Amino acid sequence: MARKKDVNAEIKEVANEQVKDNSYKAWNERSNEEKKASINEYSKAIIAKAIKEKATFWGKDMSKKDIDNSMPYNASKGIAYTGQTSALLRAVSELNGYEKPSFLTMKQANFLGGTLKKQLDENGKPVLTKNGKEAYEQGVKIALLKTESYVPKLDENGQTMTRAIKDQNGNQKIGKDGKPMFEIVTEKIYHKTPILETVTLYHTSQFDNLKMDKLKERDLESLEKLRDSIKKSNYDTRPNINNLGLGEKVTRDINNFLNAELKGLDYSKIQDREVTKTQTNEKEQNKSQGRGM
């Protein structure tokens, strides 16, 4: 069956081309600023693609109800995404024509029996990587600040600690090789400086064998609780995409949309209407002046 070109893969290619410093550096070796530049370029490419394809979710008025019912969400937890994450997932959903904006991490999908689909070209043939291997569907990279991590816990001799893996009855599990099973003990550590990382989200349709009956619907009740807490907050919680370096008008409109989404308000492009009204008045004035000549 013929399929259109993978939009997510195309966006990734464009973003890679736009990064000024093409010298390779492993992700873990990059500074937060270097990571941020890469992530911002990728995010910018998504919005630019949406504009090019006229898939602009911010280009139309939406009621609170319509905004709520179209919010991207995590299908494992039911939690709705807000802020820049919502903007990117909304754009990708419209670009790919996803019927329902439900997303999962790879780990969540695997836990639900899902396996990532292979990427196919416009003719339905497998897409190959530069190494000649079959490529898999591309997800959407989302930035997050990591303030803590789990690392292997060491004993007094500096050795990694382990513990027995037990079944529901408290008995130690035995592996296929007939040996007792163990797992590494971990402990939480806090980073003095938050580390910028990414998590990749995939649409539920990008997986085979996913246990659809285990997926959750969008949890609007938790969303309303979040909105209530925001009303009581003394902090400026307005989300923005100012860091992406987009045009002034696009940045303004998306920021206004995300603010309406987070606070549970209707969204309308008031400023665009004012511009249109001004242009109409100017045309009428020109016509009147023309008739008077």
PLM regions: where:
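N-terminal accessory/interface modules of nucleic-acid-binding and processing proteins
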Residues: 2-292
